A protein has these predicted regions:
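Hydrophobic/aromatic-rich transmembrane helices and adjacent perimembrane loops
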Residues: 1-8, 161, 193-194, 200-221
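Perimembrane helix-loop-helix junctions
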Residues: 2-35, 220-222, 226
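Alpha-helical transmembrane segments of integral membrane proteins
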Residues: 3-4, 21, 25-33, 125, ...
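Hydrophobic alpha-helical transmembrane segments in integral membrane proteins
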Residues: 38-59
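Transmembrane-helix signature of polytopic, lipid-linked glycan biosynthesis machinery
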Residues: 39-43, 144, 170-174, 187-202
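Membrane-proximal stem/loop segments at transmembrane-domain junctions that anchor or position
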Residues: 53-133
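A juxtamembrane structural motif centered on a specific transmembrane helix
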Residues: 177, 216-233
Length: 233
């Protein structure tokens, strides 16, 4: 969620007010408010784990889960939408669990993050391919075919399609470059960028569903206002 916070603050700074000074102030206030809210969690982690972790110690794991040799080899050369499972995944889990046995959470997070970054540096082309595949999965109309029945996927796609169309219309509306819509758009962009690199599936969209709903609803409202203007002009 830090990426959402950063993008939201930047959007508020850039588009929150016609005055650059007011926009900068509002963006700073947004950051300060977030720090105040998250401080108890960071303090708890500092006491329990020995370090002021502001979000989670799971980040290194999810980055490594999406960027390792076994994943690249097993998924990237299979048909689109392939789900990572089987011997390669099990072997990776076993290796990681053995190597990190007895290691504290913060150190394990650091090691896995560094391992993932080394893999991406070693295989940049595959890293880009994997990022594009995750982007597609993050914004997929329906969940993975390998996991869910066709009937479930059809129902989800029928529900999601009009929302996505409304979201696109909302993003194209010129008023989206104003607060609070710009902040919502910033949050969407922030989480999308994160999950191009970290492990993802459709449920990872959950934190930005309110932002998606706001922009999708604004498209309908904008259409109604334009229609009313045409009738009265």
């Amino acid at each position: 969620m830090l990426a959402c916070l950063v993008m939201a603050a930047l959007a508020e700074t850039a588009y929150g007010s016609r005055s650059a000074r007011v926009g900068l102030r509002n963006g700073a206030l947004l950051v300060v408010a977030a720090v105040v809210v998250m401080s108890p969690w960071a303090a708890r982690n500092a006491w329990a784990l020995g370090g002021p972790v502001w979000t989670t110690t799971h980040g290194g794991y999810t980055l490594a889960l999406a960027n390792n040799d076994a994943y690249y080899d097993d998924v990237l050369n299979r048909p689109e939408g392939a789900v990572w499972t089987g011997p390669g995944q099990f072997a990776w889990f076993d290796r990681v669990n053995c190597e990190l046995a007895g290691v504290d959470e913060i150190e394990a997070d650091r090691r896995l993050r560094n391992e993932a970054l080394r893999t991406m540096e070693k295989r940049p082309r595959d890293a880009v391919r994997a990022a594009v595949a995750r982007l597609s999965r993050f914004w997929s109309l329906a969940p993975d075919a390998a996991v869910y029945a066709r009937s479930v996927r059809v129902v989800v796609a029928v529900w999601t399609t009009p929302i996505w169309l409304a979201l696109v219309l909302g993003l194209l509306d010129s008023r989206t470059r104003q607060a609070p819509r710009a902040v919502a758009a910033g949050m969407i962009v922030g989480l999308t960028i994160v999950h191009m690199f970290y492990w993802t599936d459709v449920r990872m969209r959950a934190p930005i569903v309110p932002a998606i709903a706001l922009l999708a609803a604004s498209a309908r409202r904008g259409h109604m206002h334009r229609a009313q203007w045409v009738r009265t002009s």
